[in-house]
Amino acid sequence: MLIDGISRQSIESNDNYKVKIIDQTLLPHELKYITLNSFSDCCKAIKDMWVRGAPLIGVTASYGMFFAAYENPSKRNLNEAFKKLIATRPTAVDLKWALENIIKLIENAPTKEKPDLIWDFASKLEKKSIEQCSLIGDYGLEIIESHIKNDKTINILTHCNAGWLACVDWGTALAPIYKAYNKGIDVHVWVDETRPRSQGAALTAWELSKHGVNNTLIVDNAGGHLMQNGKVDMCIVGSDRTTSSGDVCNKIGTYMKALCAYDNNIPFYVALPESTIDFNLTSGVNKIEIEERAQEEVTLVRGINELGKICNVKITPNF
């Protein structure tokens, strides 16, 4: 998508086996590109959330397996790499899906061919993610158009970040919004701040604004009030994992928005590629592993101070 009129991707690779990502922990205050040069770089990028979003995690992990094979293509090392990558963000099923497919791909391959086979898989997955998200956008555009009333502005609420920053390009939940904007539809987005990591405030509001899409940042608990007062026409969110029965596991807070939408008779949509569906699960409650992250993500808020420095500020009592 566009950053100040220039087309960008959240992850980019080239024929020289170079992989470049955006350090999303610095957004919206600093746009910094980082080159991933090793398996450990990829693990750190996922674990520390330089990259995030289920589809992007899957692509990044695939390149991580390439680096693992390049460094040591032995079966033992690659099995260890598989386990380490799975542990970085266990909720996102795209991660597991991509890695399991890589293991199957190289199972009987000659050792010296493994790195190139994995690189080819990763680069194709990168391109496939873009194609899938574009198609999600096309389908979602039809849904948006069906909810437009009397040529008025259509107000869409979204939670967390399921845009191009999460999916190489286009995004899932935001792809239909970008397609609508590009078509000239008067679309406005209510952006949940999405505590504790504030992906909505830091990422969704940033990428929508950079593309020119009208949006308003709201606190997480404002959605129900807006719905009660007729200011939300529809909701679109992404998914970290969806079961075969349709249970959706997404960023904390999504369930409450779904309940509010249901109570106010507002359409609620989830946008996702097939790789986000876990066909081995029929129920999401208590069956999907939910990662537990550091308490500092709640007690500290990251931002920019009056000196222009990015820093953390403590907002709670000492525990």
Task: Enumerate the predicted regions with their spans.
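Positively charged, low-complexity intrinsically disordered leader regions
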Residues: M1-S40, K44
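Short beta-strand segments
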Residues: I22, T60, L157-N161, I236-G238, ...
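A short, flexible beta-alpha/helix-coil linker loop
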Residues: L27-P28, M65, A162-G163, R241-T243
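Short, glycine-rich nucleotide/cofactor-binding loops
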Residues: Y33-F39, N161-C167, S244-C249
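Short, hydrophobic/aliphatic alpha-helical segments
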Residues: I34-W50, I154-I156, I304-F319
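N-terminal active-site beta-alpha-beta segment that forms phosphate/nucleotide-binding
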Residues: D48-I218
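Conserved phosphate- and dinucleotide-binding cores of soluble alpha/beta proteins
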Residues: D186, T194-F319
